[in-house]
Amino acid sequence: MTTLQTQPLNTLWYTRCPVPTGLGISIQKGWLKEKFNEQQIEIKSIRESNSKDIRNSHFNHTLANSVRHGGSIPAIWAYASGQKTKVIGLSWADEVQLLLTRYDSNIKTVADLKGKRFGIPLNQDAIIDFSRAQAIRGLENALKTVNLTVSDLELVDCLRADILAAQQQQPEENDSSFYGNRNKINASAEIVALIKGDVDAIFLKGAHAAQIAHDFALHTIIDIGSHPDPILRSNNGTPRTLTVDEDFLTQYPEQAQSIVDAVLQAEQWAHAHADETHRYLAKECNSSEQWVHAAYGADAHLKLNTNFDEISIIALQDLSDFLYRWNFIPAEINVREWLAQDIFIQAQVA
């Protein structure tokens, strides 16, 4: 790889989604900071920044010298929109992906959904409405198991006008924050619609889904996240992408390798420390160990694996094709051209 480094790297920006990732464990353990401090490089959190533009880089990856580990839909959208990024690893941690209805509903199977109202979140101010995309993806995948299509149902946009009004009163610095006041008043509109009876079924995934299904005694029509076909399980979190901006990779390949090293170190540690890892994952997911266990299984610590498995690449392409077909991204992409496997291979050898 040709190195075009012109000046020393002073700061690495990082971000990860509130889901199980090796990067998240590495950050909590202090290993990412340690590796970069040894090189006199400061690390800073994108999600904890006071700047809205910097926080938004979690979704659009516009910030130079940054790494992101999380849901693939925003990463795909950024790349398809022209942002020059590279994937330096893929991780796959299967999670519950639930189609849910009320306990008193007569909908018991996926086939029963034909002709019914399916609630889909609509986030008008989102840079990329990944919640909407993953809901349609989960629904479409589930319907394939009974030879139905999304057109066999009525999609109902779910939008909370009262939440939007409250959000507009929030200070600008809290806009798009992950842990600020905006988050406290933000409830999933599709959940409210289901409880009120305005829709017949919805899609939720992860620890949040497990808890909501329990707390409201919802009936699980199907957990498509446990289907034997990995393509039908593929969604925003399966696989997740570890991405950096392309200029960073070109100019600072040793630092990019340090990121991969830190992620792999965290995952190897997790495999041998189940209880501690589950506690860390609960923090990462903004949840409890109970719901992490319900969503990801007792072997959640063993599901932290970053690599370039062929099935992950195929699933990522399938997800990208879905996003283009549903107009979530502006252009088709070839995911193999997006991958930077050489850095990952070098890290494994080292």
Language-model-derived ranges and their functions:
Residues 321-350:
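Conserved C-terminal helix/tail region of periplasmic/extracytoplasmic solute-binding proteins
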Residues 38-46, 147-155, 285-297, 330-336:
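Short, surface-exposed acidic
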Residues 33-37, 228-233, 303-311:
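Short, solvent-exposed loop/beta-turn-alpha elements that line the ligand-binding surface or hinge
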Residues 250-328:
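Secondary-structure end/capping motifs
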Residues 7-151, 155-158:
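Short, glycine-/small- and polar/acidic-enriched structural segments
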Residues 1-10, 350:
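Short, low-complexity disordered leader/linker segments with a strong preference
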Residues 73, 164-280:
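Pocket-lining segment of extracytoplasmic ligand-binding domains
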